[in-house]
Amino acid sequence: MIDLTKIQYRVVVMDESKNQYNIKEYIENLGWEENDGELSVRTSFVAKNDKTSKGYLSKIIKPGCLVGVFATDGASQDEEVARGYVETWNPVEKSGGHTLKCTCYDELYKLQKSQDNRYFPSGTGTKSAIEGILDDWEIPQESYQGPNASHGKTVENNKYLSDIIINLLDDAAKKGEEQCFVQARKGKTSVIPRGSNKTVYVFRMDNTQMFSQSISTADMITRVKVVGKADDDGRTSVEATVNGETKYGIRQRIYTRGKDESLADAKSAAQEILDDEGKIKKEIKVQSPDVPFVRKGDLVYVMSELAQSYYYVKGIQHTVDTYSMTMDLELAEPKKEKASSEKKKDYNVGDIVNFHGGTHYVSSYPGSKGYKARVGKAKITIKNGSGKAHPWHLIHTDSGSNVYGWVDDGTFD
């Protein structure tokens, strides 16, 4: 159990020469937030722009400097809870004293501010597509624990990269994969499932300032119509209609079946849309004393007269001056178990498979060198490699892919 009365913070800045300074004693206003629909953590503070032994604070903190926020509970936890590079630098001079206002964003901010054109051929895996974007923008990666669904042909023109990544993860979830998100922690990026936190904090009325619950059908989808590709005249044919809670009225979504997508798969995707967006939306807002270790995507438990259940954190704002935080929560629905008929396919040497794209390695052993390979058809030439880290050996069967080496489980179907 955490003792909130013992929470303490420190703020460390790294200057242009890589020197580090604890500037907490100069900070007047500090907060950080993670918002729904965004990838990056936003940190802001106002500091007294006093003269130090190294000069005025504004001479130490400059645009591009790295700022880290650390918190301790006075016992077992003492860790970095937010970091960012100074993007907005605003020294203010006034008669009552000088101040410095700064806004910082972490490594994922460049994806929120960068547009690109991306083409993913049919069969591209989620992992390959997302890691390709992170590699191109030179964003350090820690781990990938996310989905690796096979996507239909996807063309994204003039789209923000953060939106492309969110769309890929949402599409994978519609195909039955676990809902995941991208998070930067200590300078490295990971793709992880919601609710991956090991410690689940409980919020009760006696340790919380405010609970507010909302129930809404405003954005509810009650019918999905599956259509085929348009003909030369631009007309599309209706191939299936999947109904949900139509008692709330018809709120229709169109799903266009991909060229290489079966009707059964398209209907399954339509059902996933209803499963995800065809429910009454139940959200709750909680204001409580600050628990600085809680992040967006975490699982928490709420006990109040309004609700007693598990929730995912959709957005969170930490305010250090008032030692408080505000969480926007989404009900954590029980995870659906896949049908027993969905058994893992048994692949054998000689099978022709669809490689999702990604990395192929020079050997099956851990630590072997890897190279990027394109999505496409390939033949399994060896299974159960003795090194076990990359157990499958694939060789491409056409010029679409260039895979010729050892690959991981789950990188083909």
Language model features by range: what are they?
Residues 1-109, 204-213:
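Assembly/oligomerization scaffold segments
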Residues 89-106, 319-332, 386-394:
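Short, solvent-exposed secondary-structure boundary/capping segments
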Residues 395-413:
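Intrinsically disordered, low-complexity, charged/polar segments
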